[in-house]
From Swiss-Prot:
The lineage of its organism: Eukaryota, Metazoa, Cnidaria, Anthozoa, Hexacorallia. This protein is encoded by at least 3 different genes. At least 3 other genes code for a similar Av2 with an Ile (instead a Val) at position 35. Expressed in gland cells and nematocytes. One of its GO terms (cellular component) is extracellular region. Keywords: Cleavage on pair of basic residues, Disulfide bond, Ion channel impairing toxin, Nematocyst, Neurotoxin, Secreted, Signal, Toxin, Voltage-gated sodium channel impairing toxin. Residues 22-31 form a propeptide. Binds specifically to voltage-gated sodium channels (Nav) (site 3), thereby delaying their inactivation during signal transduction. Has a strong effect on crustaceans and insects and a weaker effect on mammals. It strongly inhibits D.melanogaster sodium channel (DmNav1). It strongly affects the heart sodium channels (Nav1.5/SCN5A) and weakly inhibits the brain sodium channel Nav1.2/SCN2A. In vivo, when released into the medium, this recombinant toxin induces impaired swimming, paralysis and death of the crustacean A.nauplii within several hours. Changing L38A: 27-fold decrease in binding affinity to cockroach sodium channels and correlated loss of toxicity to blowfly larvae. In vivo, slightly affects fish larvae after several hours. The keyword Disulfide bond applies. Gene3D superfamilies: Anthopleurin-A (2.20.20.10). It comes from Anemonia viridis. This is Delta-actitoxin-Avd1c 1.
């Protein structure tokens, strides 16, 4: 029983180490700018494409434009 607990704790610690090593710059960009979204100019799929738009809930602010013809279902996908 104690061995299983020790293995579980070690796996948990390893998982936390991996998660904390994820690119912190990407997290800072999301915190500063909001949630990224896929503009029409980014391509048809999110796989391998950069998400150049930002979701705004109350419409695009001044200096930004809606960069997606359809969706997202909540808010607008805007690009500067």
């Amino acid at each position: 029983m104690m061995n299983r607990l020790l293995v579980f704790l070690m796996l948990g610690a390893a998982f936390m180490l991996v998660v904390s090593a994820i690119d912190q710059d990407a997290n800072e960009d999301i915190n500063k700018r909001g949630v990224p979204c896929l503009c029409d100019s980014d391509g048809p799929s999110v796989r391998g494409n950069t998400l150049s738009g930002i979701i705004w809930l109350a419409g695009c602010p001044s200096g930004w434009h809606n960069c997606k013809k359809h969706g997202p279902t909540i808010g607008w996908c805007c690009k500067q």
